[in-house]
C-alpha cells in the first residue's frame, strides 16, 4: 500500500460495495504484518472508519484541509500498536472541493513519507468525482465490485474516470459479503 511512494485508494461505484470493510481489513492486516500503517477516512460524505475502531471523530481530515486542525489528529488504534487512523472529523459541506485542493495532495505525500503503508477509504463514485480525485492524489487505486450489485457500465465508467490521471491500478476485487 506504499509501493513507490503511493497511497492506495479503495474505490467503487456505489455505496454498500464494501469500501470501508475492505480498507479497514487491509489496514489491520498490513499493520499486523509489520510497518506503521495509516488508514485515512477520506469519505467526507458518509464517514464510518472512526466507528469501526471506536475512535473520536471530533476533528480530522476535513479540519486539516480547511486549516482548522493539524496532523496531531491522527489516532493510534489501541489494540494494534502499528495501526493509526485519520478520521474525517466534521463532515464538510464541500467535500469534493476540499480533496481538489493542493493541500490534499501535499498531505498525502507527507503521510506516505511518514508511514510504511497508507490506505484510503473513499466515497462512492456515484456521489461525485471525489473518489477519482482522491485516487489521483494517492497514486494507486484498488477497485471494488460487489457481486450481484455492481453494474459493469458503472465499473467501466469509474475506471475510465481514472484514465487520464497518474493512478496505478492495483486491481479489481470482486466482493461478496
What are these regions (language model features)?
Residues 1-177:
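P-loop NTP-binding module
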Amino acid at each position: 500500500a506504499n509501493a513507490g511512494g503511493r497511497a492506495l485508494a479503495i474505490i467503487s461505484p456505489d455505496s454498500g460495495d464494501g469500501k470501508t470493510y475492505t480498507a479497514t481489513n487491509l489496514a489491520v492486516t498490513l499493520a499486523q504484518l509489520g510497518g506503521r500503517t495509516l488508514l485515512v477516512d477520506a469519505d467526507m460524505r458518509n464517514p464510518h472508519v472512526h466507528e469501526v475502531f471506536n475512535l473520536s471523530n471530533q476533528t480530522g481530515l476535513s479540519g486539516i484541509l480547511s486549516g482548522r486542525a493539524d496532523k496531531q489528529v491522527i489516532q493510534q488504534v489501541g489494540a494494534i500498536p502499528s495501526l493509526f487512523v485519520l478520521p474525517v472529523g466534521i463532515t464538510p459541506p464541500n467535500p469534493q472541493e476540499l480533496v481538489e485542493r493542493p493541500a490534499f495532495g501535499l498531505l498525502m505525500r507527507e503521510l506516505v513519507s511518514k508511514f510504511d503503508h497508507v490506505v484510503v477509504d473513499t466515497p462512492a463514485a456515484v456521489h461525485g468525482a471525489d473518489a477519482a480525485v482522491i485516487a489521483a492524489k494517492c497514486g494507486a487505486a484498488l477497485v471494488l465490485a460487489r457481486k450481484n450489485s455492481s453494474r459493469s457500465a458503472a465499473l467501466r465508467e469509474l475506471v475510465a474516470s481514472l484514465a487520464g490521471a497518474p493512478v496505478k491500478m492495483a486491481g479489481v476485487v470482486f466482493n461478496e459479503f
